[in-house]
Amino acid sequence: MELFDLTGEVAVVIGATGVLGGAVAQGLAMAGAKVAVLGRNADRGHSRVKLIKGNGGTAAFFPADAQQRTGLATAHKAVSESLGEPTILVNAAGGNDLKVTVTPERPLQQIALEDWKENFDLNLVGGVLLPCQEFGPAMTQRGRGSIINIASVSAHIPLSRVVTYSAAKAAVLNLTQFLAREWAPKGVRVNSITPGFFPAEQNRKLLFNDDGSPTARTKSILGHTPMGRFGEAEELVGAAIFLASAKASSFVTGADIRVDGGFLSQTI
């Protein structure tokens, strides 16, 4: 449908080497966008590109560490020369770290400050700030663009144990709204997507035991999710295409779309 056709758009997906970012990258490509897969893991990046091309899409891998501005600048230049100037930016890098996960044996006061800063910067500075600083100005100069930041249900209600991740993702929502306000007059829309619980590398140890059985945390999560299941990575694609499309979401900025199976709607 033309409303969701991204033909002619160039999308940069940072963190496309991961499960969620990879699914979004593939979805944008299937909607017609040329996709730049950015990430640190070259093997995963090339695998994602191969998958996209195998399904008829256009994509290329560009190595980049989202926490290094110079590396992002190098990748930006390469993307522009290879695919064209980006009109869509998806910030999907980030994740929790067991070093900053609160446990009975490691309460909050025992988390090392350097570990806190490392994970906080991964999710906020590298997760949103630096990519927006690098790719945003070119969009504002051209007078068009869409930026999509991946948040988390823990940004709305801090979940137990993942304190640093929750704080950083809450900041992601705040920064998203700030940028939406600042860049709206210049034609750039900035929104976020809040995924619920999607099994991926960074949360697998919290959700499953070594033998593959669900942890007590998983049972609690599913009991609190009205749909009673985890999300599938492909279920983020619809929201991403909607926000990426200048036709479908032309008057949408500063918004957060929850793809959480009703998790944040549940009380008792």
Language model regions located:
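Conserved glycine-rich cofactor-binding loop
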Residues: 17-18, 41
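Short C-terminal tail/terminal secondary-structure segment
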Residues: 1-2, 157, 227, 241, ...
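C-terminal helical subdomain
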Residues: 123, 127-130, 185, 192, ...
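Active-site helix of classical SDR
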Residues: 132, 168, 176
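Residue(s) in the substrate-gating loop at a strand-loop-helix junction
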Residues: 152
